[in-house]
């Protein structure tokens, strides 16, 4: 299992870094200002059947601070959380650049371990 740098993390439960590595897809409008990143976690570790109702945000944490989104969809089976899909939106070039700095740090933290 890949160890994630503690300074860069994704959290659904405050204080608990998600260990599952997401699939991430980026979408941008033609004008380049608005867009979104769609995260899919196929085996989330921090979201369980006992705490999934309390999960309300995805937090993207790095040295600059915290980005967050409330757009979270869960796929649940009888005995576990199967998939988490979360969407982070940006509405300006500055917000996109900030997101990309987080994404770069997150990717680098995974490749260093």
Swiss-Prot record:
Membrane topology according to the record: Peripheral membrane protein
Main location: membrane
Assigned keywords, A-Z: Membrane, Photosynthesis, Photosystem II, Thylakoid
Protein's cellular compartments: Cellular thylakoid membrane
Recorded superkingdom: Bacteria
Subunit comment: Part of the photosystem II complex.
PANTHER family in the cross-refs: PHOTOSYSTEM II REACTION CENTER PSB28 PROTEIN, CHLOROPLASTIC (PTHR34963:SF2), PTHR34963
HAMAP family: PSII_Psb28
Family statement: Belongs to the Psb28 family.
Protein name per its UniProtKB record: Photosystem II reaction center Psb28 protein
């Amino acid at each position: 299992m890949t160890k994630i740098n503690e300074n860069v993390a994704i959290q659904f439960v405050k204080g608990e870094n998600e260990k599952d590595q997401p699939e991430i897809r980026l979408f941008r409008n033609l004008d380049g200002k608005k867009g979104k990143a769609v995260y899919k976690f196929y085996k989330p570790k921090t979201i369980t059947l006992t705490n999934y109702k309390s999960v309300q945000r995805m937090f993207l944490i790095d040295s600059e601070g915290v980005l967050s989104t409330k757009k979270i969809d869960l796929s649940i089976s009888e005995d576990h959380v199967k998939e988490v899909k979360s969407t982070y939106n940006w509405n300006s070039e500055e917000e996109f650049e900030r997101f990309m700095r987080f994404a770069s740090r997150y990717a680098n933290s995974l490749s260093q371990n």
